[in-house]
Amino acid sequence: GHVPCGKDGRKCGYHADCCNCCLSGICKPSTSWTGCSTSTFN
């Protein structure tokens, strides 16, 4: 399913769709950041 992410509450199906939500839940601006993933959200 999709989850809200980011300050604007955008919905996304993949981490990379939404400023790369990392495992910590912090959004990063690029997939090149350590810990970011393009895995699907559960």
UniProtKB/Swiss-Prot annotation:
This is Iota-conotoxin-like R11.15. InterPro entries: Conotoxin-I_CS, Toxin_19. Expressed by the venom duct. The keyword Secreted applies. The cysteine framework is XI (C-C-CC-CC-C-C). Iota-conotoxins bind to voltage-gated sodium channels (Nav) and act as agonists by shifting the voltage-dependence of activation to more hyperpolarized levels. Produces general excitatory symptoms. The lineage of its organism: Eukaryota, Metazoa, Spiralia, Lophotrochozoa, Mollusca. One of its GO terms (molecular function) is toxin activity. Belongs to the conotoxin I1 superfamily. It comes from the Eukaryota. One of its GO terms (cellular component) is extracellular region. It is found in: Secreted. Keywords: Disulfide bond, Ion channel impairing toxin, Neurotoxin, Secreted, Toxin, Voltage-gated sodium channel impairing toxin.
